[in-house]
Amino acid sequence: MAVWLPAQNKFYLPPQPSTKVLSTDEYVSRTNIFYHASSERLLTVGHPFYEIYKEERSEEVIVPKVSPNQYRVFRLLLPDPNNFAFGDKSLFDPEKERLVWGLRGLEIGRGQPLGISVTGHPTFDRYNDVENPNKNLAGHGGGTDSRVNMGLDPKQTQMFMIGCKPALGEHWSLTRWCTGQVHTAGQCPPIELRNTTIEDGDMVDIGFGAMDFKALQHYKSGVPIDIVNSACKYPDYLKMANEPYGDRCFFFVRREQLYARHIMSRSGTQGLEPVPKDTYATREDNNIGTTNYFSTPSGSLVSSEGQLFNRPYWIQRSQGKNNGIAWGNQLFLTVVDNTRGTPLTINIGQQDKPEEGNYVPSSYRTYLRHVEEYEVSIIVQLCKVKLSPENLAIIHTMDPNIIEDWHLNVTPPSGTLDDTYRYINSLATKCPTNIPPKTNVDPFADFKFWEVDLKDKMTEQLDQTPLGRKFLFQTNVLRPRSVKVRSTSHVSVKRKAVKRKRK
């Protein structure tokens, strides 16, 4: 009797082939022309903890928030190289080629002295010292307000990354409950990891995690005051490294350090998640402390030996497929540096002059300010892209806006006969089609960046700029000439005549 049995082995079907992403080196050719661009001295002044409004409920900001724990995202605007007038007509053919910029060097200058940044909260939730406890405090769920005024130094962070698109950040935030899932009021809500664009002014992780504190901490006492209404973002290095085109991060440099300064516990009940009874032996008074532990960070020593800024960086190979090509004639530089975070204390007398007599604290008004100083210098290389059908197809798949900026049309004209009215806006004809004219829309118009216009800052004389001279020495283009030492004193030496022997 013949019996059919299913096959016991499992067949592996390979995934569908995807479009191969080519490196920019395969369709972008580089020239031997380099340019230097440098910004002016970039300064910003503000309050280190919060914004100051003109009135209590007004939206007019009179003093901005300038914290050393914020991201600085510079949008470097470069000129269009296709509009340059080159003396060498054989450099490129505008009918067959287009010019783009390639990043080769970068230096981020930082002014101001090194200093420890200080943060804190006047009503910080510090219930008990659980690192060195001297007594058992189990009244964390009582009605007594145990919050204190506490300051600390945050995690020390130095980081910068550059690309032709803004960097991505990640943080944990509140999410919705699943449909049909039963939950009660006061239950711990579900959270999810979100990816957002890092904008200028976003807060950095200072040692309390990358999360949305405004949505996940309702009592506004668990973290320092500068992040209590913000979301601390951490750069999503994993996602940017796996990006197909590699436009968001050509390369990055980072240095982070911290240690646990104090270990404490939080006040408040533990909600619907108490400590399991099988994890401890019961006490006679049934007073069990809370397990909501946390540590206060400390960035420790700040020294000039560990500085990442005020030094040049050269790009030979990017981490992604984009090897430093600035599509759209722009670059996005994301910077974090809280090693120069000294808060400036300003004291002013009530009559705008020092008070006479004995010191009275109420006679003076105290203010806080924080200042930052930057300078950005870059070396860019002139590159060419041939307008071949293959190259245009690659670039159009990557970003169609690049083709539009080059004033090219990849779609053929329509073969149908359309109607065109001469007096379309008159009362004698039909109503015009309500289609707004198509304009170039900035894809990053809704984001906040520090725009730095470098269109009038380009120079080809690299030996006249500090970064340009470093680049020339690095590439063996310029070497110091050998100095000939000439003797200024002449000493006459008398030689004795050599007597010849007579034969």
Curated annotation (Swiss-Prot):
Keyword presence, Disulfide bond: yes
Recorded superkingdom: Viruses
Pfam families the UniProt entry points to: Late_protein_L1 (PF00500)
Keyword Transferase: no
Example of a GO cellular component annotation carried by this entry: host cell nucleus
GO biological process, one term: endocytosis involved in viral entry into host cell
UniProt subcellular location: Virion; Host nucleus
Main localization (coarse): virion
Gene Ontology molecular function, alphabetical: structural molecule activity
InterPro entries attached to this UniProt entry: Capsid_L1_Papillomavir, Capsid_L1_sf_Papillomavir, dsDNA_vir_gr_I_capsid
Region described as Disordered: spans on this chain: 270-289
Keywords, in A-Z order: Capsid protein, Disulfide bond, Host nucleus, Host-virus interaction, Late protein, T=7 icosahedral capsid protein, Viral attachment to host cell, Viral penetration into host cytoplasm, Virion, Virus endocytosis by host, Virus entry into host cell
Protein task: Forms an icosahedral capsid with a T=7 symmetry and a 50 nm diameter. The capsid is composed of 72 pentamers linked to each other by disulfide bonds and associated with L2 proteins. Binds to heparan sulfate proteoglycans on cell surface of basal layer keratinocytes to provide initial virion attachment. This binding mediates a conformational change in the virus capsid that facilitates efficient infection. The virion enters the host cell via endocytosis. During virus trafficking, L1 protein dissociates from the viral DNA and the genomic DNA is released to the host nucleus.
Quaternary structure (record): Self-assembles into homopentamers. The capsid has an icosahedral symmetry and consists of 72 capsomers, with each capsomer being a pentamer of L1. Interacts with the minor capsid protein L2; this interaction is necessary for viral genome encapsidation. Interacts with protein E2; this interaction enhances E2-dependent replication and transcription activation.
Family: Belongs to the papillomaviridae L1 protein family.
HAMAP family: PPV_L1
The protein's name: Major capsid protein L1
Organism: Canine oral papillomavirus (strain Y62) (COPV)
Gene: L1
